[in-house]
Amino acid sequence: MNLLPCNPHGNGLLYAGFNQDHGCFACGMENGFRVYNTDPLKEKEKQEFLEGGVGHVEMLFRCNYLALVGGGKKPKYPPNKVMIWDDLKKKTVIEIEFSTEVKAVKLRRDRIVVVLDSMIKVFTFTHNPHQLHVFETCYNPKGLCVLCPNSNNSLLAFPGTHTGHVQLVDLASTEKPPVDIPAHEGVLSCIALNLQGTRIATASEKGTLIRIFDTSSGHLIQELRRGSQAANIYCINFNQDASLICVSSDHGTVHIFAAEDPKRNKQSSLASASFLPKYFSSKWSFSKFQVPSGSPCICAFGTEPNAVIAICADGSYYKFLFNPKGECIRDVYAQFLEMTDDKL
């Protein structure tokens, strides 16, 4: 989540994002970057620069390599460069320069994927990165792109050249035609893959519907309704076995849906009435909670199967627990920016 345009809190937080399995999250700051264990919350790394903001931090699971892009009032690095930071050596070891601003970076053990505003470039993850592929996208200012971290699945998903379409490419066999999914009529605002790379969830800028597709066929599996009013979707994430998804938006609410068992989701008692509009047959979240501050947040499932974590732009950390009935309670609250690495 790039917080640059929407973080009014003055706490120096520019970016927050989870690693591939959501076990850690990283923060880009006006004076460096930080890495935290997600659940339980613990500061793992704090790298401060005397002068220099980091607008994007991408982790590779828990290994010592991170991708950094400069940002903020005084960027540490030019915003058109990707810097690979070796946290053991405490220095950058790879640098890739582009002619335009970098919107996002994705990593897997063998690839560096760089998102520009209308194209995606794929490089080898080597000391001297070699460009392998270039894919055109529609205008993509949010840097939407997801890369499957599974060693047996090299799937890359990104906005297609047509509005609302998602393109799926297998980086291990790019000679195969990509899967093109006409996911929404409007502009995409969020996409997410499950860990296995078999499901993709999408939302448009309208933000009322979440759709889940099979990645091999492109077929729609489920359509879920977040709400009736438009919303800016900040984050969608699957749990470990892809049976649940959580969704955060600018309404200050985190919704939890059943992705595999639609009967768990709520539905109107009028759902079976064929003469009523499609809205009445919608599947709604079976559980939701309000982030008390209403601050922009990203969300993911915790170490317990019934736990959801919210990381907020105001520096708040929330852990909520939900039961099979959908009831939610707040279990943990903390201010993660005020922690030090010797505190829990």
From Swiss-Prot:
Q: List where the motif L/FRRG motif lies.
A: 224-227
One GO molecular function term of this record is: phosphatidylinositol-3,5-bisphosphate binding
Database matches in Pfam families? PROPPIN
Q: What is the effect of changing residue 65 to A?
A: Strongly decreased interaction with ATG2A
Q: WD repeats located where? A: 2-38, 44-87, 93-125, 130-171, 176-215, 220-259, 265-314
Q: Which UniProt keywords apply?
A: Autophagy, Disease variant, Epilepsy, Lipid-binding, Lysosome, Repeat, WD repeat
| Outcome of mutating residue 225 to A | Abolished binding to phosphoinositides
Instruction: List the InterPro entries hit by this protein, alphabetically.
Output: PROPPIN, WD40/YVTN_repeat-like_dom_sf, WD40_repeat_dom_sf, WD40_rpt
Which tissues is it found in, per the record?
A: Ubiquitously expressed. Highly expressed in heart, skeletal muscle and pancreas. Up-regulated in a variety of tumor tissues including ovarian and uterine cancers.
Effect of changing residue 35 to Q: reported as: Strongly decreased interaction with ATG2A
Q: Which GO terms describe its biological process?
A: autophagosome assembly; autophagy of mitochondrion; cellular response to starvation; glycophagy; nucleophagy; pexophagy; protein localization to phagophore assembly site
Q: Which GO terms describe its cellular component?
A: cytosol; lysosome; phagophore assembly site; phagophore assembly site membrane
Secretion signal span: none
Q: Where is this protein localized, as stated in its record?
A: Preautophagosomal structure; Lysosome
Q: What result is annotated for mutating residue 226 to A?
A: Abolished binding to phosphoinositides
Q: What does this protein do?
A: Component of the autophagy machinery that controls the major intracellular degradation process by which cytoplasmic materials are packaged into autophagosomes and delivered to lysosomes for degradation. Binds phosphatidylinositol 3-phosphate (PtdIns3P), and other phosphoinositides including PtdIns(3,5)P2, forming on membranes of the endoplasmic reticulum upon activation of the upstream ULK1 and PI3 kinases and is recruited at phagophore assembly sites where it regulates the elongation of nascent phagophores downstream of WIPI2.
Which PANTHER family does the UniProt entry name for this protein?
Answer: WD-REPEAT PROTEIN INTERACTING WITH PHOSPHOINOSIDES WIPI -RELATED
* Family assignment from sequence similarity: Belongs to the WD repeat PROPPIN family.
Annotated disease: Neurodevelopmental disorder with spastic quadriplegia and brain abnormalities with or without seizures: An autosomal recessive disorder characterized by profound developmental delay, progressive spastic quadriplegia and contractures, early-onset refractory epilepsy in most patients, and brain malformations. Neuroimaging shows ventriculomegaly, reduced cerebral white matter volume, and thinning of cerebral gray matter.
Domain remark from Swiss-Prot or TrEMBL: The L/FRRG motif is required for recruitment to PtdIns3P.
**Oligomer and partners:** Interacts with the TSC1-TSC2 complex; stimulated upon starvation. Interacts with RB1CC1. Interacts with ATG2A.
State the protein's name: WD repeat domain phosphoinositide-interacting protein 3
What would be the name of the gene that encodes this protein?
A: WDR45B
